[in-house]
UniProtKB/Swiss-Prot annotation:
This is Small ribosomal subunit protein uS8. Residues 1-29 are annotated as: Disordered. Part of the 30S ribosomal subunit. Contacts proteins S5 and S12. The gene is rpsH. Residues 16-25 have a biased composition (Basic and acidic residues). NCBIfam families: PRK00136.1. The lineage of its organism: Bacteria, Bacillati, Cyanobacteriota, Cyanophyceae, Synechococcales. It comes from Prochlorococcus marinus (strain MIT 9211).
Amino acid sequence: MANHDPISDMLTRIRNASEKRHETTRIPASRMSRSIAKVLQKEGFIAQISEEGEGFKTQLVLELKYSGKHRHPTIRSMQRVSKPGLRIYKNTRGLPKILGGLGVAIISTSKGVMSDRDARKQGVGGEVLCYVY
């Protein structure tokens, strides 16, 4: 079955694994999924990224992070913003601040995929892919 929105699929896999307290989750590898995973790791939502397989069967293995004695997920919510049917673009001044700066908006810019903070620093806008907090 064809996957028409691989970014939504990635976010759903991470969200489900996090809610079930799984150590890792596997995601089909692509340039976009690697970029999003690197931003999540840089922002502290994912512990480690590795790859398994080769060719078009390559998968990203994401090691999820939890906090505290009761292993609360560091990812509380992930929301897809720009969808295939309705793309959402923002300029530098229009980039959203998620929970007053506690969350992250992941932006696809002309300089690559980055967090909203990095996009503001570099003075670029782009497509708002998702919110993570």
